């Protein structure tokens, strides 16, 4: 998504815990001649509330405002019966997939209110819209994602130029998909680049006024 947004003129802020991976994306964006990105190492699993506020202050000083926020970080957690999931594993999934997403969103809202056209995209899942056995904490976290999106969208409706929507990527050629379905041929699934149209639509001005909706990328 970052490379696609950059190719359409966005100045992308790459936030995540694996700096080496972020640098690879940064280099690809630079090599393509797109607007210079920024790398922000940040561990969503261990970050405390005050660190999200400090991040927002840093970004305000560096960039002034935020026009778009894509929540794309998730961990799968154990795929097993609920009774067999440890409290530690459940809380870890909820921390990355829900708590950190909430704190990052609320920290960024003041910067997004400075934009005349701002968009928040929450990455959901089919198991966040209909529960399925053995999807455990991941399914619960994606239901929470949809709930956060809907609640925030209703609060923003008519009060802000910010819109919030969710996207279910569907079966995509990712490492998480391979972990969830180890026997599946990944070549049967589209790449991330192939499901970008809905993300571009929601992040761009064409979706102004579209708020509180759940989209499927496929």
Predicted segments with their positions:
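Active-site-adjacent segment of SDR/Rossmann-fold oxidoreductases
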Residues: 130, 151-162
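C-terminal helical subdomain
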Residues: 158, 162, 166-167, 174, ...
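Canonical Rossmann dinucleotide-binding motif of NAD(H)/NADP(H)-dependent dehydrogenases/reductases
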Residues: 1-13, 17
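Substrate-binding pocket helix/loop in short-chain dehydrogenase/reductase
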Residues: 55, 80-82, 89-91
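Active-site helix of classical SDR
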Residues: 105, 141
């Amino acid at each position: 998504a970052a490379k696609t947004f950059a190719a359409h003129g966005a100045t992308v802020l790459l936030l995540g815990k694996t700096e080496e991976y972020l640098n690879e994306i940064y280099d690809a964006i630079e090599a393509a001649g797109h607007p210079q990105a920024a790398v922000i190492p940040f561990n969503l699993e261990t970050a405390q509330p005050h660190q999200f506020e400090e991040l927002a202050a840093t970004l305000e000083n560096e960039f002034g405002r935020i026009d778009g926020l894509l929540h794309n970080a998730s961990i799968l957690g154990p795929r097993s019966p609920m009774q067999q999931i440890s409290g530690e594993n459940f809380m870890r999934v909820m921390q990355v997939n829900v708590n950190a997403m909430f704190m990052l969103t609320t920290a960024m809202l003041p910067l997004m209110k400075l934009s005349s056209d701002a968009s928040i995209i929450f990455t959901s899942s089919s198991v966040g819209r209909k529960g399925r056995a053995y999807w455990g904490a991941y399914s619960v976290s994606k239901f929470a994602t949809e709930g956060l999106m809907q609640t925030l969208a209703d609060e923003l409706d008519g009060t802000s130029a910010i819109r919030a929507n969710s996207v279910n990527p569907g079966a995509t050629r990712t490492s998480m998909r391979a972990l969830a379905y180890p026997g599946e041929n990944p070549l049967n699934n589209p790449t991330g680049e192939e499901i970008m149209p809905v993300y571009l639509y929601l992040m761009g001005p064409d979706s102004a006024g579209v708020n509180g909706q759940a989209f499927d990328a496929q």
